[in-house]
Amino acid sequence: LGVEKDEHQAIGWYKKAAEQGHAVAQLNLGWIYANSPSRKNWEQAVYWYKQAAEQGDPRAQYNLAWCYGNGSGTPKNPRKAAYWYEEAAMQNHATAQYNLGWCYENGFGVEPDLDKALVWYHKSALQGQITAQYTLGWCYGNGRGMEVDMAKAVHWYTKAAEQGHTTAQLNLGWCHLNGKGTPVNREEALKWYLKAAEQGNATAMFNVGNCYAHGYGIEQDDKQAEEWYLKAVRHGNKKAASALRHLASKQEKEKKTDSED
């Protein structure tokens, strides 16, 4: 009841200020209408985001773009989404910059333009936006709109991985294991595979199993390999099931050899 009362009072104060043209109050009122379980009203959220966006508030511009892009509180309109993302991006809103890059890459509300997409991904990544950092790493690693440059791929994967991006951690582990863009470092590969695995990434779990099975970056340990393969199977990794069978077959052969000795 206390929270409900506080929210009711907040809406009252924000509304007074918003109606007098206060952009931050308009933004906050929009946010309440978009997020409050008891007062959710996307149409009102869009209305107030638009008021603040037209006054130049980059957060409101980003939120309004998101609403247009997702059809929340307003009919879906990719062109308006891209427009408002650009308005926010020009004011250095990092996630708006990433989303604008995505719009240009995918032709969402704008003509497809990979060069422009990469410019915006880069601006966003330099501000520390995690998805932009991963995406830029992937583009460098796969030659998407540029020459393949594995050293730059590793650079951007590392930035995203350090912020907890699971797929960046997985890909960074692969780079360290295979010496792509960085010298081979199996210990470092295992470190990043473990971080991704701890976040529930099934491929990383399988890769940790492989590290234990083959002694990559750690002492070879069939029992640990089996445990990680089982985790990977439980998370839907099909290769791990095959690896388990191979491991069981290997252990069976070793038992036979021991008994023959």
Model features per residue range: what roles?
Residues 3, 28-35, 63-70, 74, ...:
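Hydrophobic face of amphipathic alpha-helices that form TPR/SEL1-like repeat modules
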Residues 1, 6, 19-22, 35-36, ...:
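Short helix-capping/linker turns of helical repeat alpha-solenoids
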Residues 234-261:
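Terminal, low-structured helical/coil segments at or just beyond the last alpha-helical repeat
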